[in-house]
Amino acid sequence: MTALPRYAVFGNPVAHSKSPQIHRQFALQEGVEIEYGRICADIGSFAQAVSTFFGTGGCGANVTVPFKQEAFDLADEHSERASAAGAVNTLILLENGKLRGDNTDGLGLVGDIVKVQNTEVEGKNILLLGAGGAVRGVIPVLLAQNPARIVIANRTRAKAEEVAARFGIEAVPMADLNGGFDIIINGTSGGLNGQIPDIPPDIFQNCALAYDMVYGEAAKPFLDFARQSGAKQTADGLGMLVGQAAASYALWRGFKPDIRPVIEYMKAL
């Protein structure tokens, strides 16, 4: 009996990940069976965990917090998106045995904001909260939409300034933020611990969309705060998750899934 194609998501923590359910839905659309698991790699042992996975028959992998920049360093070659971001969320095993790193986070985010949340990015003022691999991954695709400006703010100011310099955007200390943003995107992971970024509530006064890149309960603290502070519309990152997963699946298998029924399926769980 032929072994099923095997995929996985690497992270720490990763037990909460919905990626296995999402990719099973994609496989049903394609009419195939696959294996898709969760691998919690120890901090400091990510490279070894990836090597073991691909060395024992793995076909492709997703990478989540906190390993996206390590995945970039590990990949033998990179897509333009990944090179621009300096972060990788998708590893593809090539026929020559090398690993290609790609980044589909930005595709998932922009696709959800524009197509599902019906909010244009072009010509808008955008605030990004956080400066980690997740945020780096979405900036190139956001810039390609021609926003009026992108501002980045982070708890550690130097990290925000480093990212801003890399992409030619603005960095502002969190405490100095004021209104004027159409779209505010939270890319910090504090919601996993029930925390929100240390930001003034009045930045949401003219905000058309407050978006958290995480999903479910972890997004609730930020989105509740945004709503109470005046944001007109809020959304968690479920659509982004499904969208980036669909782009990864297409890179691995050459089949492009329809994300809308999968988003509805995940909401119903």
Swiss-Prot record:
Active-site residues, Swiss-Prot/TrEMBL: K68 (proton acceptor)
InterPro entries reported in the protein's UniProt record: Aminoacid_DH-like_N_sf (IPR046346), NAD(P)-bd_dom_sf (IPR036291), SDH_C (IPR041121), Shikimate_DH (IPR011342), Shikimate_DH-bd_N (IPR013708), Shikimate_DH_fam (IPR022893), Shikm_DH/Glu-tRNA_Rdtase (IPR006151)
GO biological process: amino acid biosynthetic process; aromatic amino acid family biosynthetic process; chorismate biosynthetic process; shikimate metabolic process
Keyword line: Amino-acid biosynthesis, Aromatic amino acid biosynthesis, NADP, Oxidoreductase
Binding-site residues for shikimate, renumbered to this chain: S17, K18, S19, T64, N89, D105, Y215
Keyword Hydrolase recorded: no
Gene Ontology cellular-component terms listed: cytosol
Known catalytic reactions: shikimate + NADP(+) = 3-dehydroshikimate + NADPH + H(+)
Gene3D superfamilies attached to this UniProt entry: Leucine Dehydrogenase, chain A, domain 1 (3.40.50.10860), NAD(P)-binding Rossmann-like Domain (3.40.50.720)
Entry superkingdom: Bacteria
Oligomeric and partner information: Homodimer.
Family assignment from sequence similarity: Belongs to the shikimate dehydrogenase family.
Function: Involved in the biosynthesis of the chorismate, which leads to the biosynthesis of aromatic amino acids. Catalyzes the reversible NADPH linked reduction of 3-dehydroshikimate (DHSA) to yield shikimate (SA).
Protein's UniProt name: Shikimate dehydrogenase (NADP(+))
Gene name in the database record: aroE
